[in-house]
Amino acid sequence: MVPRISAAIFIFELLGSNSEGVTDLRLWLCQPAPRCGEWTYNPLEQCCDDGVILDLNQTRLCGSSCTFWPCFQHCCLESLGSQNQTVVRFKVPGMKPDCKSSPITRICAQEYHPKSPVSRSDLI
């Protein structure tokens, strides 16, 4: 009987604890934890990107020199004639990433891909 009471008091004290570094466990007990595939994650520190759990501050390259945050943005390759450009677009919460309709964050780089070799006289 004494171990049950001790365990109940311990859990009550743990839930009522206001010590730093301890998150409010009552919030986690009342709400289902978000899932990424079969894994749960902490949305205050992580996100689920295409079935992979990432840290919120993780970055990736878009093109050769432009960084973006995959938790909040996605990288798109767009072509205009013979030029390709990488564009970072916002991810719209609750919607699947779409390179055509998502708002543009920034245009990263343009790369020229000529259909035929360019001679020096073409540039002058």
Swiss-Prot record:
Q: Please verify whether the record's keywords include Glycoprotein.
A: yes
Q: Name one Pfam family in it.
A: IGFL
Q: According to the record, which residues are glycosylated?
A: N57, N84
- Signal peptide span per the entry? 1-19
* Keyword flag Nuclease: no
Cysteine disulfide partners in this protein: none
Location(s) in or outside the cell = Secreted
GO MF: signaling receptor binding
Q: Which body tissues produce this protein? A: Detected in the cerebellum.
Q: Which domain of life is it from?
A: Eukaryota
Q: Which UniProt keywords apply?
A: Glycoprotein, Secreted, Signal
Q: What are the annotated GO cellular component locations?
A: extracellular space
What family is it from?
A: Belongs to the IGFL family.
Question: Which PANTHER family did the record assign?
Answer: INSULIN GROWTH FACTOR-LIKE FAMILY MEMBER 3-RELATED, INSULIN GROWTH FACTOR-LIKE FAMILY MEMBER 4
- What is the protein name stated in its UniProt record? Insulin growth factor-like family member 4
This chain's source organism reads Homo sapiens (Human)
